[in-house]
Amino acid sequence: MKILVLNCGSSSIKYKLFDMKAKSILAQGGVEKIGLTGSFLKLTLPNGKKVILEGEILEHRTGVEYILGVITSEKYGCIRSLSEIDAVGHRVVHGGEKFNSSVLIDDEVIRKITECIDLAPLHNPPNLNGIYAVVELMPSTPQVGVFDTAFHQTMPDFAYMYGLPYSLYEKYAIRRYGFHGTSHRYVSKRACEMLYMSYERQRIISCHIGNGASVTAIKNGISVDTSMGMTPVEGLLMGTRCGDIDAGILTYIMEKENIGTSAISTIINKCSGVLGTSGISSDMREIDDAIEIGNKKAILTSDIYTYKIKKYIGAYTVALEGIDILVFTGGVGENQFRIRQKICDGLEFIGIKIDEATNHIRGKETIISTTDSKVKVVVVPTDEEFMIALDTLSLLS
């Protein structure tokens, strides 16, 4: 069975075509700068070589059509006809309270995703555009929606409710939703497979640390709490997002700077986090380089960054009444051993010990805890696209 996975962003589309029987990737790439000057499709050939194909891609339908044309082309294709694609799986960012699992897409599902646009105005519209494009271009092909938020719908109410008037929840569905759910679900399951441990009997803390970052507490296979909130701004210090902040600071800044909601949103989403505190970059690799030459703001940024992650690990150890497995994933979590080391330093009292030599491995599935560590510490490169493909396969079955 062949499954195409699409991840449609505001000006981009990432794609992977899987052969599920062979568990292999037949094609992968992405369209960039949709609706902008200089749009192009970048694809990765089986030998690893990158190819860039320029073209005028004005909207998502054109982008999806371009992708379908490439994967069936004589020069770069891997299939002869679109009829070989058995289903299309879509990443959908926000399912609100309407979806607690992946679903086959029909008119009713599309209507409900549309109703969630208020909760993710930048993400759900392009996700829908991808769905509409496939409806038009491959009308007989089943589609599946896999939601970033669905995994966290198992959180208890005392974990997802905010201390605001209850009427605001009733009117506007203001609550914690959490994100990166597909990633947390994939890496936590994969970690248990690596360790030959039952997923349904473990207390797992999953750290997805990249430009966006979140920590999730998973008990017996379900999410019980997560650091991101109603929006992806809450929680950890991220590339350009501030993370946890006293809400009173926002009104204070608005008054002092004489700015409105749009400007304050830009500050907390685009100008804060690692970039804001360091004044250097949103990329932790560049922060590491600056630390090497003694840059004080870079050192402070790294301290804030790792301290916040440690706080969440501590809090979630309490929420889970212990911890069996700690998982690192995401661009930083998978590749920056110094950050992993700094996070784990001082956590011996809860049973976390990591092997310094093994921890130096980058970007590979690795057990980095020592043999006598009570808590297993695992690095798992995330694969959200494969998880989407697995969900799609499961629903078709």
From Swiss-Prot:
Q: Which UniProt keywords apply?
A: ATP-binding, Cytoplasm, Kinase, Magnesium, Metal-binding, Nucleotide-binding, Transferase
Q: Where is this site: Transition state stabilizer?
A: 180, 241
Tell me the pathway: Metabolic intermediate biosynthesis; acetyl-CoA biosynthesis; acetyl-CoA from acetate: step 1/2
Its subcellular locations are: Cytoplasm
Kindly list the biological process annotations in GO that this record carries.
Answer: acetate metabolic process; acetyl-CoA biosynthetic process
Which SUPFAM superfamilies would you find in this protein's record? Actin-like ATPase domain
Give the co-factor note. Mg(2+). Can also accept Mn(2+).
Residues recorded as binding Mg(2+), renumbered to this chain, are: 7, 384
Q: Where is it chiefly localized?
A: cytoplasm
Top-rank taxon of the source lineage equals Bacteria
One GO cellular component term: cytoplasm
User: Which co-factor is required?
Assistant: Mg(2+); Mn(2+)
Q: Which residues bind substrate?
A: 91
Q: GO molecular-function annotation terms?
A: acetate kinase activity; ATP binding; magnesium ion binding
Known catalytic reactions:
acetate + ATP = acetyl phosphate + ADP
Q: What is its EC number?
A: 2.7.2.1
Q: Which family does it belong to?
A: Belongs to the acetokinase family.
Q: Which proteins does it associate with, and in what oligomeric form?
A: Homodimer.
User: What name does this protein carry?
Assistant: Acetate kinase
Taxonomy, top ranks, is:
Bacteria, Pseudomonadati, Bacteroidota, Bacteroidia, Bacteroidales
Q: Which gene encodes it?
A: ackA
